[in-house]
């Protein structure tokens, strides 16, 4: 026989951002505990609303499965004396396993005989195990910022106010944080009252009758369908925003969507000025027409039924109107001061107490950005546009609009720059230089946006590392990992052949020229090369690169990000071919032997066998062409050229012994192999491939 199990933890309102993590934890914890307790079940569901977490296990067995195990003990020679009597070791082992010494038996493992005990454990009734399982599930949940309440030491997302625990129709009796488990749940805060749950099987149905839709996926789907239906009524649609949809899903228990109107006199404002207060502050969904143009409507979702919707609609419209009135005022006031004049106001804004003002930071970014443009071989006019972009990129930080709506930084700067006639390249660069703003965000596409974005992020990373701020574990308050990943992503997409070491050094000089002291450059270079290599590895793994391919490539460093990625791409393709096997074998054999060489260059005059003389000549013959291919970054052709040496290397190993007694000849041969390693390793250290 089997019954359904339900545990509901009722709380005060929980932040929406906690919900996805708790759902995963609750599911994993319930599965783990059932497995450890040997409790079979048919299905497992987890639920969350702003006022509860719950787990429903369908078809949970009424008793544990019986358990039989064979436990290994001491070796036979230690378990029995010469007369075959059990020693203290055997007796102690038997006692620890709850069996008699006479019940021990012998089995062989890896050629050694050991004594074993066979343990049998009868399954206990499930109801006896569930009180502890329930408390373990509750205490096993973790939250970013748990809180205490009353005089309790226990911490949780928010204070727990009730606990429902049922196995079939029977209450699972236990007490936790001063609350006794029972059948009494609570419905919607204003529409529903107390709910006495009859059985776990009726949980969703009974809670819905009390205006609580406990299944978050069902709530999400309901919200999305209602939004679409309302948008269609005004000939519009809603662009899917998963983050906003998830947030709304997790702040309501009973969704009812409603359509509101935006006053026409605000529709002249830039679109982000209208949609940012909607989405970020009010959790409204903007409505667009079929071409994507913003319509004077929004959709919001009420936590309740359709009672007095007209009043709720008017209230939401009033709140948005106040927000947009503020925005319109800021927009007018900001236009009274040209963007270029705002740059000087950045002197009064501290970036970091150890790294100067934002104005100083702008100068560093400006210098670094122009340097990057020059390194990329851009003409003077383009360098000027890059420098102008960098100068104006942070000016909007002192505007009224960005002060009240920080999400609009860069967006407003681009708009204000356009108004005063800045070049399109400058306006686009200002808009794009914050990108990528989050994981999965678009990368900047304009050369001004790409260069200023890299300069901006490098300045932030070098400065932070330079004063001892580094990401640790899950802590990265300055988003340095995301910024480094942005640098890597931009360089890869743009295909820049540029030295990371040189960029770090140039950034370091900018700090020094402002009198800002950082850690020694050598220490900083080492730490940052490792840091960026980790980010490059992450990006390439996300693109499908195998870990050992990256091990091989990155063993040679990642100073030139684009080249390292190109090597990984070529190596991934070549290792799938049949000719790669003898190639890698030759490389590894040459590598292992060449490690025994003294540090002296190859002198071909010391070679005597025709095979080694021919190999040395082939190396010299290909040296110039090979160097040119490496300089150009053409690793596929460099590999093809190196492959021509494989038959000669195999002939050498078949013809001569490397480790001869003649020291001069031995060292010459080892040096020759070292030369082979340098060429064959053009794609990486192949000995690291699995």
From Swiss-Prot:
Record-linked SUPFAM superfamilies: HD-domain/PDEase-like
Protein name (database record): Glycine--tRNA ligase beta subunit
Organism: Desulfitobacterium hafniense (strain Y51)
Subcellular location: Cytoplasm
Gene Ontology terms for molecular function: arginine-tRNA ligase activity; ATP binding; glycine-tRNA ligase activity
PROSITE patterns: AA_TRNA_LIGASE_II_GLYAB
HAMAP family: Gly_tRNA_synth_beta
UniProt similarity note: Belongs to the class-II aminoacyl-tRNA synthetase family.
Cellular component terms per the entry's GO annotation: cytosol
Catalytic function, reaction form: tRNA(Gly) + glycine + ATP = glycyl-tRNA(Gly) + AMP + diphosphate
Keyword Nuclease found: no
Annotated EC: 6.1.1.14
Chief site of localization: cytoplasm
Keywords: Aminoacyl-tRNA synthetase, ATP-binding, Cytoplasm, Ligase, Nucleotide-binding, Protein biosynthesis
GO terms under biological process: arginyl-tRNA aminoacylation; glycyl-tRNA aminoacylation
A Pfam family reported for this protein in Swiss-Prot or TrEMBL: DALR_1
Subunit text: Tetramer of two alpha and two beta subunits.
Entry keyword Oxidoreductase: no
Domain of life: Bacteria
